[in-house]
Design a protein with these regions (language model features):
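Short N-terminal segments immediately surrounding and downstream of signal-peptide cleavage
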Residues: 20-34
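Residue-level signal for short, function-critical loop segments
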Residues: 65, 79-80, 169, 219-221
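Primarily recognizes the serine-hydrolase "nucleophile elbow" in alpha/beta-hydrolase
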Residues: 137-209
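The feature captures the conserved acid-bearing segment of alpha/beta-hydrolase catalytic domains
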Residues: 189-247
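C-terminal catalytic histidine-bearing segment of alpha/beta-hydrolase fold enzymes
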Residues: 239-282
Length: 282
């Protein structure tokens, strides 16, 4: 029994050495109608689970090993149509890869559409009213995640002026809305929307401080996100802000960190190289 307890203590200690602390972010659910706790559901095209009915926003902290630390940080916003959180291939797997490149990662579970408001066979149909309403809350969670990382920069051994945010699909919408609505204390220093679902984001001007942007999308994406992604790039480029667009053909929606055996598999390495090129990695 004592040996088992010691083994559990070692596992627990090793887990915490990785920095996987979970922080509850400030929130106000006025105007939202949640019933019951968050729910684990089967993920899309995977045996790993997603989360639904998230009513309490959190970040899970993943810190690189000391000798790898570049003092750069990234808030990671998984996708899921504002109804689910694809926390593995668009969250934890991303955090692990970022840590391997010396980047601290904060995986965000932002608030989602209450599960009882989603019809059993209801798809994502225009005008996306539930999802647009939820974005008003989700982007606040992203801003609070940035503010937390910046306020605790010494604790996490990161540079408060090298905090980025990236997101996939609906997480890309959260990324963009947070950027548009940011203030000095919670604005990202660079952003990376990956196949962002811009159909729920109102057309807005890039913020005046001009955060560098790295965009990835495919024309094969069934959600038709290539043109909106190109528009984001054009909006930034017209103002001479640092902007880079990687538009591939092959790659179905939601690839995240999964391998497709197409050139789009290079997107992550390209993103890290870009972060380095704009002076945010060293």
């Amino acid at each position: 029994m004592r040996i088992k307890i010691l083994r559990l203590m070692v596992i627990f200690y090793s887990f915490n050495l990785l920095g996987q602390e979970i922080i509850t972010l400030p929130y106000d659910n006025t105007g939202l109608d949640y019933q019951g706790p968050e729910v684990k559901t089967k993920g899309y095209f995977t045996d790993k689970h997603n989360f639904q009915n998230i009513s309490i926003p959190t970040i899970q902290v993943f810190l690189p090993k000391g000798n790898l630390n570049t003092k750069t940080a990234m808030i990671v916003c998984p996708g899921g149509g504002m109804r689910a959180n694809a926390i593995h291939h668009e969250g934890f797997d991303v955090a692990k890869a970022l840590n391997e490149r010396g980047i601290a990662a904060f995986v965000l579970k932002y608030r989602l559409v209450p599960i009882h408001l989603i019809g059993k066979n209801e798809g994502l149909d225009h005008p996306y009213s539930k999802e647009k309403k939820q974005l008003a809350y989700g982007h606040l969670d992203a801003l609070n995640a940035i503010a937390h990382a910046r306020a605790n920069a010494l604790k996490y051994e990161i540079n408060p002026e090298k905090i980025g945010i990236m997101g996939f699909s609906a997480g890309g919408a959260v990324t963009m809305e947070a950027t548009y609505k940011s203030s000095e204390k919670n604005r990202p220093n660079f952003i990376a929307p990956i196949y962002p679902w811009m159909k729920i984001v109102d057309n807005q001007e890039p913020p005046a401080y001009g955060p560098p942007i790295f965009i990835v999308c495919t024309t094969e994406d069934a959600l038709k996100l290539a043109i909106p992604s190109a528009k984001i790039y054009t909006d930034w480029a017209e103002k001479n802000y640092i902007s880079e667009l990687h538009l591939y053909h092959h790659g179905k929606h939601g690839f995240g960190m999964r391998k497709t055996n197409y050139p789009v598999d290079n997107w992550f390495d390209n993103m890290v190289d870009w972060i380095d090129a704009i002076g945010m990695l060293n």
